[in-house]
Amino acid sequence: MKKKLPLNLLSALFVLAIGSSNAHAQSAFTGFYGQVSSGYESNQLGSLSTSSTTIPNINSDIKGSSASQSFGGTPLVLGIGHYWQANDKWLIGVGADYSALSQTSATFSRDSTNASGNTTIVAGSTLTYNGASMQLSNRFNLFITPAYAIDKDKLVYLKAGYSQVTAQYNRPTSATRTVNGVSTTTAATGGSQSSNQGGYLIGLGYKQMITSGLYGFIEGNYMGYSAPSYSTNTTTRASDTLHGVSSTGTRTLTHNFASLNTFQALVGVGYAF
């Protein structure tokens, strides 16, 4: 019986050593990675409110509004990052990704009414501006990504961080005035303005090794941004003197959107170095 004790003890230690080795096996995702993905992107642009104010006042101030817009398409997202092994089951990482394709809404219109105390839109008539749109481009995300290793070759992860997108507002290209059922369309100023909208990113994903280094993944991301706002100043035209003002003035036109957010559902492949 005494001779069996050392053998039993060695066997037990061997089993514990094997178990400890497996428990602390390094994840295949530890280190640098690069990846590419595509899928579907949905953008929600909040309702638009506008105002036109002229100084000195020539009784031509108006305000306008448009409904919220939804638009989407197929993105192309390029990503890089690095994972560190925190313990046997958890990794912590940092990453960055960039959306290489722009997304543009369908054109939309805005209906205008007189600002308080102004009468440039006469009773019985309407004024509608047509052909506006929004284009989103150059989206990039910077994030931290804690991950849980299901096993050496499988990973679930979260993403949280900062997102920025360039929002280009394309102003209306025409204006339609309807008086007593008769419509007349003329060219509008048009043009565009861009702003960089910052916000937050949250995401969830799953990665699985296909072969040594090569992996596939699925991912969902939500980005919420500050509301886009634009302002332009122009000099009142000589024809404005018909409203009783002989000197030139300044017209300020503002466009304020209520919100901007984006959802992405992605499928892709990557390589862990």
Regions found by a protein language model. Give the residues of each.
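Short N-terminal segments immediately surrounding and downstream of signal-peptide cleavage
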Residues: S27-Y40
